[in-house]
């Protein structure tokens, strides 16, 4: 079952990206390095609901 998640910038706490993930294949929280338009640099983004 795929669920909707938001990715939050760890530096400025903005929800910049929304995506889906398969909970069966990825039970842990997703962490990706993505570009934050508010910080104007690549930062670590973590999964939240």
Swiss-Prot record:
MF GO annotations: structural constituent of ribosome
Top-level division of the source organism's lineage: Bacteria
InterPro entries listed in its UniProt record: Ribosomal_bL33 (IPR001705), Ribosomal_bL33_CS (IPR018264), Ribosomal_bL33_sf (IPR038584), Ribosomal_zn-bd (IPR011332)
An annotated GO cellular component: ribonucleoprotein complex
The UniProt record lists the keyword Lyase: no
GO biological process, one term: translation
UniProtKB keywords: Ribonucleoprotein, Ribosomal protein
Annotated family: Belongs to the bacterial ribosomal protein bL33 family.
HAMAP family named in the record: Ribosomal_bL33
Protein name: Large ribosomal subunit protein bL33
Gene source species: Caldanaerobacter subterraneus subsp. tengcongensis (strain DSM 15242 / JCM 11007 / NBRC 100824 / MB4) (Thermoanaerobacter tengcongensis)
Lineage, highest ranks first: Bacteria, Bacillati, Bacillota, Clostridia, Thermoanaerobacterales
């Amino acid at each position: 079952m795929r669920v909707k998640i938001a990715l939050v910038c760890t530096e400025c706490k903005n929800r910049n990206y929304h995506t889906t993930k398969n909970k069966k294949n990825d039970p842990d929280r997703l962490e990706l390095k993505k570009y934050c338009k508010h910080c104007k640099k690549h930062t670590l983004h973590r999964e939240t609901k």
